[in-house]
């Protein structure tokens, strides 16, 4: 099954992949060559550290290539869901107790980053929001107990 991903999320992954291939991979290859020049490889900590870093970089490159090849990239600016919450929606919620507003965008699992306000489509919050409309209330089971929010606005921004 293909994993949904926003075009912006796919672009971020492509940029990371390009950086790893064009900058990090050559750096670590040079570091390995430099460490080899120091002689005995058995007790050469620089060599072993560089090889470990190379392994990490190559693993991340393979992971990113796989994620991108299995992604279903969705251009959310072309969605016409109106005020209904679907994948890609940017939702502003107001806590009904504190009136504190929070803004989240519902994205694919691979691009989720709560610090940036990006929540995974599979998260409990996103699952509770899908299908709701502006003005609807939603109850979320949070670690600190149940919280009730009102959907203040729904937008489809890139």
Swiss-Prot record:
Keywords for the protein's UniProt record, in alphabetical order: Coiled coil, DNA-binding, Transcription, Transcription regulation
Does this entry carry the keyword NADP?
Answer: no
**Alphabetical GO biological process terms:** DNA-templated transcription elongation; regulation of DNA-templated transcription elongation
Tell me which domain of life the UniProt entry assigns to the organism this sequence originates from: Bacteria
Q: Kindly indicate whether the keyword Transcription regulation belongs to this entry.
A: yes
- InterPro entries, per database record: GreA/GreB_C_sf (IPR036953), TF_GreA/GreB_CS (IPR018151), Tscrpt_elong_fac_GreA (IPR006359), Tscrpt_elong_fac_GreA/B (IPR028624), Tscrpt_elong_fac_GreA/B_C (IPR001437), Tscrpt_elong_fac_GreA/B_fam (IPR023459), Tscrpt_elong_fac_GreA/B_N (IPR022691), Tscrpt_elong_fac_GreA/B_N_sf (IPR036805)
Cystine connections = none
Q: Which residues form a coiled coil?
A: 45-73
Give the Gene Ontology MF terms in alphabetical order.
DNA binding; RNA polymerase binding
Recorded family membership: Belongs to the GreA/GreB family.
Function text:
Necessary for efficient RNA polymerase transcription elongation past template-encoded arresting sites. The arresting sites in DNA have the property of trapping a certain fraction of elongating RNA polymerases that pass through, resulting in locked ternary complexes. Cleavage of the nascent transcript by cleavage factors such as GreA or GreB allows the resumption of elongation from the new 3'terminus. GreA releases sequences of 2 to 3 nucleotides.
Please state what the protein is called.
Transcription elongation factor GreA
Could you tell me which species this protein originates from?
Answer: Xanthomonas axonopodis pv. citri (strain 306)
């Amino acid at each position: 099954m293909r994993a949904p991903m926003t075009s912006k999320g796919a672009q971020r992954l492509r940029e990371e992949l390009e950086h790893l291939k064009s900058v990090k991979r050559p750096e670590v290859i040079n570091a390995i060559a430099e460490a080899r020049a120091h002689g005995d490889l058995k007790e050469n900590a620089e060599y072993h550290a560089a090889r470990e870093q190379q392994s990490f970089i190559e693993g991340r490159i393979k992971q990113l290539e796989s994620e991108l090849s299995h992604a279903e990239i969705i251009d959310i600016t072309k969605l016409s869901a109106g005020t209904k919450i679907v994948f890609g929606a940017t939702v502003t919620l107001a806590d009904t107790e504190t009136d504190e507003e929070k803004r989240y965008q519902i994205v694919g699992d691979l691009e989720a980053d709560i610090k940036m306000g990006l929540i995974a489509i599979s998260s409990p919050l996103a699952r509770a929001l899908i299908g709701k409309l502006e003005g609807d209330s939603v109850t979320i089971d949070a670690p600190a107990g149940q919280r009730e929010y009102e959907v203040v606005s729904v937008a489809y921004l890139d």
